[in-house]
Amino acid sequence: MNLEAFILGYYKQFDDLLAYFLDEIVIDTKYQNKGYGTSLIKAMEDIVKINGVTLIELSSVNDKAHIHFYKKSGFYIADNFIPMGKFLKETNI
């Protein structure tokens, strides 16, 4: 059995709201651009809504395809977050 697609995320409790952080959505390249990602996002939204979530957050690769996909699903670029990172050892990236 092959795994063609999955969503991975977790719940975050803030003072006044419950959020869901969409950590990863993966679709096998054979199934991309066929509506599966949109269907997964919708199913995830339905599930987290039932559990009381009022905000979904994510971070994404900064390219046109990813931005278009998430905007098409109703997400927006948040002005109040700055992605940051720190390498803990030398890397070629």
What is each PLM-predicted segment?
Residues M1-L17, D23:
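Acetyl-CoA-dependent GNAT
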Residues Y10, D28, S59, F81:
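Conserved residues at the C-terminal ends of beta-strands
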Residues L22, I56-S60:
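Conserved hydrophobic beta-strand within the GNAT/NAT acetyltransferase core sheet
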Residues L22, M44-V48, H66:
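Short hydrophobic clusters on alpha-helical segments that form packing/core surfaces
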Residues I27, N33-D46, K72:
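Conserved acetyl-CoA-binding loop-helix of GNAT-fold acetyltransferases
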Residues T38, I50, T54, N62-N80, ...:
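Conserved active-site alpha-helix within GNAT-family acetyltransferase domains
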Residues G85-N92:
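Short beta-strand-to-coil "C-cap" segments at the C-terminal boundary of structured domains/repeats
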